[in-house]
């Protein structure tokens, strides 16, 4: 069997966490079975669909590494095809024109609500043959009235609906534009989609889509409906729970593989394993192992995963992403140490790339001010002898390598009768502007001799100026 899956977002906003997880599951399913992953843009909502949203979706997919094999296909390019299938359904008696006015439908609904019945269209135009003057009709699918429609869901097992529960769905509006449930069916048919993995908010759409496909004489794809994602308070995940856009996580300093790893574990598991490479995700992924209940989004767990990936990923890979974050701070990475070396120095104490970029600014650019508390504690008259001694030794050190720099620090402490920390902390504040940095020999090595000496000179001037 050829496996063909699709991700079909509507371009009315950014790629959000729920959509990204759906895309990931569909992508993994295709990759696991050697199949094809298709990207389809469902842009028939002309009022809300924007080019900016399309670009945001494509950018998010690229950043996550979810490459698609076919597409992107746009529904707005396929209106002629939708009209063709619509006419086929009309000619074969599977669809009909409905001339009911809004007032009639409102009256019908009000009566049903009053009788505590489920609001639904009663099919009154099923047998109407004559058009009504001045009324532009919609087109409705003639849903079967007997029997049931059922499918073996990839996630939830057997699901069945009685056809008597389903009314005659509108498949074309009065202006002729097709509706969601109809375009999806035609697209899945034409693109030979074999498996559909999507959110469980689509469960009620599935029986309608299956019936339309059967009316067209084709076998429906296999469906799998994934439970929604909740916030910690049990409500559906939204902006009030924090970031929901994939690219917002990039902007906040997360690695794409950390977010992928978190998303794949959000409702799916493989034993007790927490960390998955992409290859392992593909190897182990099984739609049957997706949980039936909603998953709860835990930002602390995502942050933990991100730190894990910062610690254990190839430093060159992390540095590639760090350069982007340095650029956001208007820092040119060529005007200082190699970002690969910065990653190695900083990753143990930084949980995000934003933290790492901000903590590494002093390597590339002189700072305007010292951290007030650090300067008050360490840049004092008592620190001057140690800073002056360090300045002399560092100016003539044989090699600007870490072991020689460490030796200078130790020798200065012994010479001054001070512990290493009493020597290193004033120096750290002098060169980094704060009392927090990588180990002192590493910091000096990355900073370079000229910058180090200039900053010691500046610190000594700062201390002198405080006397006045």
From Swiss-Prot:
It catalyses: tRNA(Glu) + L-glutamate + ATP = L-glutamyl-tRNA(Glu) + AMP + diphosphate. The keyword Ion transport does not apply. Its cofactor is Zn(2+). GO terms for biological process: glutamyl-tRNA aminoacylation. Its main location: cytoplasm. Catalyzes the attachment of glutamate to tRNA(Glu) in a two-step reaction: glutamate is first activated by ATP to form Glu-AMP and then transferred to the acceptor end of tRNA(Glu). This is Glutamate--tRNA ligase 2. It comes from Methylococcus capsulatus (strain ATCC 33009 / NCIMB 11132 / Bath). The lineage of its organism: Bacteria, Pseudomonadati, Pseudomonadota, Gammaproteobacteria, Methylococcales.
């Amino acid at each position: 069997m050829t496996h063909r899956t699709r991700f079909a977002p509507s371009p009315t906003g950014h790629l959000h966490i729920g959509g990204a997880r759906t895309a990931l599951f569909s992508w993994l399913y295709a990759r696991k079975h050697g199949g094809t992953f298709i990207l389809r843009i469902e842009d028939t909502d002309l009022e809300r669909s924007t080019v900016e949203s399309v670009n945001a979706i494509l950018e998010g997919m690229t950043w996550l590494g979810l490459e698609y094999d076919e597409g992107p296909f746009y529904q707005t390019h396929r209106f002629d095809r939708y009209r063709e299938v619509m006419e086929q359904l009309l000619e074969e008696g599977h669809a009909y024109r409905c001339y009911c006015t809004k007032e009639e439908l409102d009256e019908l609904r009000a009566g049903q609500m009053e009788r505590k019945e489920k609001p639904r269209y009663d099919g009154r135009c099923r047998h109407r043959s004559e058009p009504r003057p001045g009324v532009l009709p919609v087109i409705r699918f003639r849903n079967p009235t007997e029997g049931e429609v059922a499918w073996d869901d990839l996630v939830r097992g057997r699901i069945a609906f009685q056809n008597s529960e389903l009314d005659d769905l509108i498949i074309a509006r009065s202006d002729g534009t097709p509706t969601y449930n109809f375009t999806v069916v035609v697209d899945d048919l034409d693109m030979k989609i074999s498996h559909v993995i999507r959110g469980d908010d689509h469960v009620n759409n599935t029986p309608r889509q299956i019936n339309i496909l059967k009316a067209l004489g084709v076998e429906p794809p296999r469906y799998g409906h994934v439970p929604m994602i909740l916030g910690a308070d049990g409500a559906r995940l939204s902006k009030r729970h924090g970031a929901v856009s994939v690219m917002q996580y990039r902007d906040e300093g997360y690695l794409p593989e950390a977010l992928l790893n978190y998303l794949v574990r959000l409702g799916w598991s493989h034993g007790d394993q927490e960390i998955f490479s992409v290859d392992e995700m593909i190897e182990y992924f099984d739609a049957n192992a997706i949980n039936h209940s909603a998953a709860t989004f835990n930002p602390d767990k995502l942050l933990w995963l991100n730190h894990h990936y910062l610690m254990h990923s190839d430093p060159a890979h992390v540095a590639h992403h760090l350069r982007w974050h340095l650029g956001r701070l208007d820092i040119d990475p060529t005007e200082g140490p190699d970002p690969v070396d910065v990653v190695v120095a900083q990753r143990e104490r930084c949980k995000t790339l934003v933290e790492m970029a901000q903590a590494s600014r002093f390597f590339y650019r002189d700072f305007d001010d010292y951290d007030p508390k650090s300067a008050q504690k360490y840049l004092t008259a008592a620190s001057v002898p140690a800073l002056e001694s360090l300045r002399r030794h560092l100016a003539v050190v044989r090699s600007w390598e870490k072991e020689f720099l460490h030796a200078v620090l130790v020798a200065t402490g012994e010479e001054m009768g001070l512990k290493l920390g009493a020597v290193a902390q004033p120096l750290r504040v002098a060169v980094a502007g704060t009392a927090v940095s990588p180990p002192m020999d590493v910091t000096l090595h990355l900073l370079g001799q000229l910058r180090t000496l200039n900053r010691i000179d500046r610190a000594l001037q700062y201390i002198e100026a405080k006397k006045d």
